[in-house]
């Protein structure tokens, strides 16, 4: 072969790579068609995975393309190439000892550290990834699969859980079928251990590892034996990744794994003299849970705590072990006061104490807890523990940072520390009971008047109402049915030393467990997501539960909203409804929810994310343009080289997993709030993220949402609608930070506010803006024998704040985020502004020791409330 000549395989891989990058440059907006481009990345992965040698060819071409990007300064192609390089290295079975691919990659990506954010941070993370792979081959694959399968070791207990939230009424049946396949039970722990061990030994020894022989010997091992071998292997890889010299680390790891193999009884299959054949070991399907979701709250996520309690319980117990020695002296000093408070619990029944002690002993012996014990334990504490009250935070209002030597003292525990944890649980519970009783004796009212919950045209009338005290103490929509199912160690108050995991921070612990929340829907669903996110923040601020164990990541998959027919849908097939435990909360199915003749919702939020991140537009937003039958097809089943290999998934499932695994940078979407005044004088505050419709457009949506009754009511257009006289006061923001207020009175049929996110030019603005669309009546003709007829004109104004007031208290309707369940009637005043986080939180830790020189005093600043949606590269400049 002549120098510079390429083989047919190299040409095919190069062509597939070019197709992946097609249309991602600065001129991508001029592309007239984009259907099918989302399959290019999936096609490239399928082509490369057919032969282990293809991965090295693709990596060479990615590096060559990356060097061209640096020479030409093509910013838009760097992030996709970096993601392709990362995913390809992750799936590469083995790098030959004489290969310098990773070293060349490190030199190539090191040159991009001078580029602006986020390009430099992407390359910095990629360099860290390359350094770990040079020292411990395959360690990133091991960490990913270990977390997704929930396989913990002594020093690494992090896990990753994926939750799919779909509304069966709005999502096509094919999507539900794919979600059902993803949520089916994955590989058993025995099979997962075998997969990880095969990958670890092949990544280290390469073709000199007899993979078939090793697979047979691993299958003959018991689960306990596999767990012991895997623990030693994982610990060896982690230790090797911390060695300074890469060559020394690889040699040490090779020697260590060979010793592990000899100890396990299969020395003949490792480091064989005769090289064999490499095998591609695909990434197993991640653990997924699928739920039917159409609420304004994320209370359903608490079920994950119940399902994952075996993994989460050691984590919280370890945190308490680090704090026991610090608390012993304080507990001994406070014994006199605690004895008086514990006397309050003595008035309870003896059965409650017995159930509590039996639960504590069962926790010490093992993670398996019977549901009867859980229920009795929670019922015994239900008088003193509440999950949504502001007063509950007093127990954990003051936090102290951990001592630096906390981890070193873990091995020197005293015998009585296990009992101290139970004692502190009694102590905290009795203190809450005393505080509650003292408040009831004093007769002090709750802080603040009750808020009027926004009425809904479609909300059920037979839903149970909350007690007045809860309605005043919490503005969320809790579901108390789930609490009795959670173990007591989850419902117990957080330790005052417990570090609360932030919702969004660049300094999060990489070893923490991750909860991926994947939501399917249109702009209507994005409104539900932001309301649920706001409620979750409020609840977790008052009483951390989910954020004690998980860092939350939100993923958004746009789908076209299916039109209803006006008649109830037929019962869902069996495959569309994932089986749930008999004691789990029941979720309504499509037949129960019914289908209304809804208008087709827009997908502006997903288009906005696509404009910020072209790789999101290509691989996530592009899925919406393909028919479901194409996305839900699978490849032809091929003979599996190894028994236990994962089955072929539909294309949509592969792309969803790709999105969840490699989208690591959030885009912050601004949230807006509206303060509504009703004709009765009551006020309420609601939030939205995409649109607010006012007047005739909201009333029309309400009529269409009424189902068959809409035919009787009739629907008129803006030309036949009765106009409203509205006073509109708006503010136009400027880059300088100054705002100019304008006041006008208009005769309108509709006033719509929407996020300015539809055009590429709007991304260049440094100020967040809303588009105010006015449907103004220029002239109204009212003939005696016919309906009134309006001559209308439309206009648009960019605003950041606006007040709309009905003249002479004229009422109008308001709809939030195109949601038929969030239509509010009889509104006379509407004020819209960006939503801010609470100024102060009682859960903030006490101030640290002042720095020297002391920082100048600054006033309290309120940060904007934003919804973080995960994308591949974040917002590109």
From Swiss-Prot:
Q: How does it sit in the membrane?
A: Peripheral membrane protein
Could you tell me which residues belong to the region Disordered?
318-337, 394-421, 433-488, 563-597
Stretches of Polar residues bias are at 564-575
List residues, modification N-acetylmethionine. 1
GO:BP terms for this protein?
G protein-coupled receptor signaling pathway; phosphatidylinositol 3-kinase/protein kinase B signal transduction; positive regulation of MAP kinase activity; positive regulation of phosphatidylinositol 3-kinase/protein kinase B signal transduction
* Region entry Interaction with beta-gamma G protein dimers, spans: 650-750
Q: Where is the composition biased (Low complexity)?
A: 476-487
Q: State where it is primarily located.
A: nucleus
Q: Cellular component GO terms, alphabetically?
A: cytoplasm; membrane; nucleus; phosphatidylinositol 3-kinase complex; phosphatidylinositol 3-kinase complex, class IB; plasma membrane
Segments for region (Heterodimerization): 25-101
Q: Do you know which Pfam families this protein is assigned to?
A: PI3K_1B_p101
Basic and acidic residues biased stretches: 397-408
Subcellular location per UniProt equals: Nucleus; Cytoplasm; Cell membrane
Q: Which residues carry this modification: Phosphoserine?
A: 456, 505
How its function is modulated: the record gives: Greatly activated by G gamma proteins.
Acidic residues bias locations: 318-333
Q: Which GO terms describe its molecular function?
A: 1-phosphatidylinositol-3-kinase regulator activity; G-protein beta/gamma-subunit complex binding
Q: What is known of its domains?
A: The heterodimerization region allows the binding to the catalytic subunit.
- Oligomeric form and interacting partners: Heterodimer of a catalytic subunit (PIK3CG/p120) and a regulatory (PIK3R5a/p101) subunit. Interacts with beta-gamma G protein dimers.
Function (record text): Regulatory subunit of the PI3K gamma complex. Required for recruitment of the catalytic subunit to the plasma membrane via interaction with beta-gamma G protein dimers. Required for G protein-mediated activation of PIK3CG.
Name under which the protein is recorded: Phosphoinositide 3-kinase regulatory subunit 5
Give the organism, scientific name: Sus scrofa (Pig)
